[in-house]
């Protein structure tokens, strides 16, 4: 599998949606999520020559370390930890079951990192439903599975609007955060959808 087009698509969608992500974060956070994610995406794109020569696992680790060093706020460690964990867990040619197991490891790593849990208005609320879908995929063919994953990610983002935040700056808002989707969840869904579109 050539991962370079997937990386290009995922990073470009974050750059293209910077204004949306900024607006989402201005509503319930400190307003810098979009700019931080764009900075990380641009830093990854600047390494495309290196990433294109690396294996999937090496590229995931490189991107994870890049996120940690370039993305400000909590998003750098969060997305960096997720990518580094996936680098350790994924085989070179992952199946849907492999992806589910790797996401499970990533969710556990993020829970240890930030003490967040599913249902607390974080990107875990996108990752976990997608993990469950992949784990139960069975004999779904590629096109149908990709469509379901994309829809699951989009639906899961919308569901965060009905959650009170348990972690991060938005947790101080309590019920005032209701009605607003989580910016990190939206970023995660954008990444997932862009990858599905290119597979």
What positions do the PLM features span?
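N-terminal loops that bind phosphate or other acidic moieties
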Residues: 1-199
């Amino acid at each position: 599998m050539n991962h370079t087009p997937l990386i290009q698509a995922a990073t470009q969608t974050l750059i293209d949606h910077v204004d949306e992500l900024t607006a989402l974060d201005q509503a319930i956070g400190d307003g810098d999520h979009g700019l931080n994610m764009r900075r990380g995406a641009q830093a990854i794109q600047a390494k495309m020559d290196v990433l294109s020569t690396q294996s999937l696992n090496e590229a995931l680790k490189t991107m994870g370390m890049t996120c940690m060093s370039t993305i400000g706020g909590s998003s750098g460690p969060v997305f960096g930890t997720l990518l580094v964990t996936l680098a350790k867990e994924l085989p070179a040619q992952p199946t849907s079951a492999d992806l589910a197991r790797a996401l499970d490891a990533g969710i556990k790593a993020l829970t240890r990192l930030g003490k967040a849990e599913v249902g607390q208005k974080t990107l875990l609320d996108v990752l976990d439903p997608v993990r469950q879908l992949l784990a139960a995929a069975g004999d779904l063919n590629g096109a149908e599975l990709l469509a379901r994953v994309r829809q699951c990610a989009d639906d899961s983002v919308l569901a965060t609007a009905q959650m009170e935040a348990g972690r991060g700056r938005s947790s101080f808002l309590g019920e005032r955060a209701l009605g607003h989707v989580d910016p990190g969840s939206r970023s995660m869904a954008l990444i997932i959808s862009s990858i599905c579109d290119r597979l």
